[in-house]
Amino acid sequence: LFPILLAPKLGVMRTSLLFGLLNALVAGGTAWLFRRQLPQIRMMTIQCLGASVLLLAGIFYAERLTTLAEGEIYSDEVIYAKSSPYQRIVITRWKDDVRLFLNGHLQFSSRDEYRYHEALVHPGLQSIPQARRVLVLGGGDGLAVREVLKYDSVESVTVVDLDPEMTRLFSQHPILTRLNQNSLNSPKIRIINADAFLWLEKNNDFFDFAVVDFPDPSNFSLGKLYTTAFYRLLRRHLSENGVAVIQATSPLFARQSYWCIVKTLQSVGFHATPYHAY
């Protein structure tokens, strides 16, 4: 109930306060049922009512409380913070350094993100003469798309990202559209907000080049996007001589995970070439 329904809809802060309110109400109800056996029933009732009022107020102002707490967590100014049904999105800024955090984990800094996104896109795309159809899985920030659109041969880019709040934010916020060069609003772009695994299962399109830009596999829902089942689906959607590039953690800080992903790709028939940017 907590991870499937409440947390995605209400957020972690509001859900936690809701359970606290339920506990306070249960305590108050129990005290009232046994009021004849409890000598301090009036004080207990006042305490339960007071706790319930405070928790109810906390539920009402949960978003503001979360933002205030994040102001203490992040060293830079928080310019955007919102909980979507899928994740907590926070954007910070210090001078010209804009950073994206998802569930508290740094995803990029505008000062050096180009090193990652250029390395993610250009080696693979330059190996394909006249690639026309491109698939981007994840990458709702539009930064990988920005690099893809530098190729005149590209006619269409399909972006599949689970969270509509991410693609909305990075296609509308002026600071972020400057960063991704308004890539998500290009007429060549088709944005689909869906689970990438399920979308690949149902879709029959073929692509010359695929960019798989998911966060590191830190939980089950992300881990399934690094499995043999997922990579088999991906391979079926590549055209003849098609190429896919996969974000594969770090060979320095997550060496075992990195090489596990390489071996998983090889096991489904990919000719995998591992590389990383310095």
Regions found by a protein language model. Name each.
Residues 105, 249, 277:
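Histidine- and/or cysteine-centered catalytic micro-motif in compact active-site loops
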Residues 106-119:
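Conserved SAM-binding loop and adjacent beta-strand
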Residues 117-261, 268, 274:
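The AdoMet/dcAdoMet-binding core of the Class I SAM-like
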Residues 15, 271-277:
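Short, well-structured beta-strand/strand-turn elements
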Residues 98-101, 108-110, 199-200:
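Short, solvent-exposed loop/turn elements at domain surfaces
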Residues 30-103:
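Basic, ligand-binding patches in group-transfer machinery
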